Amino acid sequence: MSDECKWLNESVPSLESASDATVRGSAGKRAYEWIRDAILAGEFAEGEFVDEVVLAARVGTSRTPVREALQRLQVERYVDLVPRRGAQVRVVTAVEMREIYQARFVLESDALRTICTRRAGVPDAARELVLQMEQAGSARDWNRFAQLDQLFHSEIVRHQRNAVIADLYDSLQPRQVRLGTRTLTEAPARLLTIESEHRDLLAAIDNHDAEGSVDVLRRHLREIPELVNAFSR
């Protein structure tokens, strides 16, 4: 067999493998997004066990992409994989809520002080995200609002130009979005307050007011007793 034929024979399987991987990847992505969005929408209650076979039928895939999706969702703390029982939707506790807010305050307040000290101003993307959030709020699309809210705060953190801190902040993204969705589902009246605080935050950054912006952030992330009571202890 010529070297050219050998090369062709070796190449064809690798192309097929790449194609198979693409199909598996797209199915896994679809399964991941479907299950994640169902959890965020409250279709699966906290503490509920979800069955791989049922999920595969609803997503329209085999069990393998569903299993891979659940493994990713475990890493992102949407579910816990319990031996011999399967995937259980994680319960968001009041303690976890406080810890997420505390972590956010540490990272975001540092970013605000840096941005204001450097007089860097508001990132353009943040202004656009505020407008998009107001549209999502008007539509009462809490999941969409929470996703945009995370992007808004992430843009501000990234604006201080510290890639390590930005990556640390974004590692909170899955829990931040889930918590935001749950917050507005439990207390939709908070929407107007949240939107007002976003505008106040932008104004403080525009004025290069470091401590003023941190004060707004502190109000924005403060504990609301009636909201904390909605979460498990």
Residue ranges: model-predicted function:
Residues 2-11, 127-135, 139, 178-233:
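C-terminal all-alpha effector/ligand-binding and dimerization domain
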Residues 108-135:
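Amphipathic alpha-helical dimerization/coiled-coil segments
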Residues 103-118, 150-188, 227:
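Hydrophobic, amphipathic alpha-helical faces that serve as interaction scaffolds
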Residues 81, 94-95, 124, 196, ...:
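Charged, amphipathic alpha-helical coiled-coil/dimerization segments
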